[in-house]
Design a protein with these regions (language model features):
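N-terminal capping/small domains of soluble enzymes
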Residues: 1-93, 329-342, 346-348, 354
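Short, hydrophobic/amphipathic alpha-helical packing segments
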Residues: 29, 185-192, 228, 232
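Active-site-proximal beta-alpha core segment in soluble small-molecule metabolic enzymes
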Residues: 37, 41-205
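Glycine-rich beta-strand-to-loop/alpha-helix junction loops that act as flexible
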Residues: 171-173, 206-215, 248-251
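Short glycine/threonine-rich loop-to-helix capping motif typified by GTGT followed
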Residues: 177-183, 215-228, 254-265, 326-329
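Acidic/histidine-enriched ion/cofactor-binding microenvironments in catalytic or ligand-binding pockets
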Residues: 201-203, 225-239, 325-340
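Charged (often Lys/Glu-rich) extended helix/loop segments that serve as interaction or gating elements
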Residues: 243-390
Length: 390
């Protein structure tokens, strides 16, 4: 973010708020595309940040949609529903029926269990509608299915309405081991080849969530580009013959986000300087932060000449856990100053404990050089959600 460019604009809005810069979003997608090449598809996991899906529609190939709520957001945004992959560990019969009734065979569905397969079988047969599915291979948790069950489904796959497109696999986020990526892709490549060798089943699509890392903290070594390029090389070595689609959320969205909060109080307790801001940990989420010890990149807006001093930045929640960062050096920090936390484009706006203490939800702004600022969501009161609806 160019601090000077936004210096005036951000003072027009009441803190706390988020800014999602869609120019930065587009740059990140272009960087990913440039490394991977034209043959690899991009699937955006919208749980990372649903507010930017319309801005991504023309630059990604598909959207991973994991709940009825996310599905409704896609409809409201006017997303091409042919780009939707209906995922999620829990699928209800009525949700599948709705999707089939309204969108026919446009959507791809993931199969996470035998009951998912049975639900999709029942719905497609009832509605006489062909559907396409991906079978999710488990990585050793509650998601997906064992290899043996996938083999069983593939072996008996003859079905009038269900077409198995391929395999889906995801094992975690913030991976910093090239070897782990290589081993996972080698395992998947071998599994896909075995499905063809053993059952004559060609895997047309492999959807893989690489979990590439975002460098959030100043003291971390930035390995984003190294991991991306290593992933691209590993994909080129695959031999199963189908299309590879990379499911990404954090790696696409994180760089575009900024969380802006204001200093509302300052004090010194037992020799430590505390700065209270009007936001808090319920609105800010950095994966890997440990007891506020790690230092994210923070811009101090309108900082002035004066003494540099370490401040522990705390939010407005009535809990000792509401510490955003400890002993961060600011120059002449004063009440009313605005602090901009960077790389908050993924999960901060959606994953925080936003209803705690009935604090208002922050405003969300979408920015681009072409359109300037757009309000995607105003400040919203949460107290109405935390008591009986009268």
């Amino acid at each position: 973010m160019n601090e000077k460019k936004f210096e005036y604009d951000i003072h027009e809005y009441q803190t706390p708020f988020y800014i999602f810069d869609t120019d930065i979003l587009a740059e990140q997608v272009n960087k990913i595309r440039g490394a991977l090449g034209e043959d690899v598809e991009l699937c955006y996991a919208m749980k990372a940040n649903p507010f930017v899906i319309k801005d991504l529609e023309e630059v990604v190939d598909s959207f991973e949609v994991c709940s009825p709520g996310e599905f409704a957001i896609c409809e409201r945004a006017g997303i091409n529903m042919g780009k939707v992959i209906m995922s999620g560990v829990h699928k209800k019969l009525e949700d599948v029926e709705y999707a089939l009734n309204h969108y026919g065979d446009k959507i791809i569905y993931t199969v996470e269990s035998l009951s998912h397969w049975q639900i999709l079988d029942a719905c497609s047969t009832l509605l006489q509608t062909p559907i396409r599915v991906l079978l999710r291979l488990t990585s050793g948790n509650q998601f997906g299915m064992d290899e043996s069950l996938i083999r069983q489904i593939v072996e008996g796959r003859a079905h009038e309405f269900i077409t198995i497109e391929g395999i889906q696999y995801f094992s975690g986020t913030q991976k910093k081991s090239i070897t782990k990526l290589e081993n996972e892709l080698h395992m998947l490549d071998q599994f896909c080849r075995e499905l063809y060798q053993d059952y004559g089943f060609p895997v047309k699509r492999l959807e893989y969530g690489p979990g590439l890392p975002i460098c959030y903290f100043e003291e971390e070594k930035n390995e984003e580009e190294l991991m991306l390029n290593s992933l691209a090389l590993s994909i080129k070595n695959l031999t199963f013959g189908g299309t590879v689609a990379l499911e990404m959320g954090r790696f696409i969205a994180a760089p575009c986000g900024f969380y802006v909060t204001s200093v509302v109080d300052q004090k010194t307790n037992k020799g430590e300087s505390y700065c209270i801001v009007d936001g808090g940990i319920h609105q800010l989420n950095y994966y890997g932060q440990m007891l506020a010890m790690k230092k994210p990149n923070i811009l101090h807006v309108n900082h002035r000449e004066g003494e540099q001093k370490e401040w522990t930045v705390c939010g407005s929640l009535c809990t000792v856990n509401d510490v955003l960062v400890k002993k961060y050096p600011f120059q002449n920090l004063q009440g009313g100053d605005r602090l901009i936390f960077q790389k908050t484009g993924a999960y901060s706006a959606t994953e925080g404990m936003s209803l705690f203490l009935s604090r208002d939800l922050p405003q969300i702004l979408i920015y681009s050089a072409k359109d300037g600022f757009r309000i995607a969501r105003p400040h919203l009161q949460t107290n109405v959600l935390n008591y009986f609806q009268l």
